[in-house]
Amino acid sequence: MYELRTYRAAPGRMPDLLRRFRDHTLALFARHGMQSVGYWHPNDDPDVLVYLLRHEHDPKTQWEAFLADPDWLAAKAASEVNGPITLSIDSRYLSLIDDLPSQL
């Protein structure tokens, strides 16, 4: 199963959000069985981060473990000392359509 996630960064906080992904989140995703497929910025909105995850197992269980991980809690707290770095997060679960082409 795939998950398309869209984050809107707080004004001026996109560098902090990307740093948290590079320094902490990517390794934590791997630890909890979530595979990063790709990361994008919309061409017309640099304050938005869109990314695609692949889940090997139940996404709900994986997210519960991720959100309870002490390393995640520490990274989140450290990155938000000066306030939240995201204004909103949207998540959609996607399934491939069997009889249509895919590169995934």
What is each model feature region?
Residues 22, 67-71, 80-83:
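Generic secondary-structure transition motif, activating predominantly at the C-termini of alpha-helices
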Residues 13-37, 71:
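Short amphipathic alpha-helical segments
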Residues 35-48, 75-104:
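Glycine-rich beta-strand-turn "strand-cap" elements at beta-sheet edges
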Residues 25-31, 59, 72-77, 88-89:
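Short, surface-exposed linear patches
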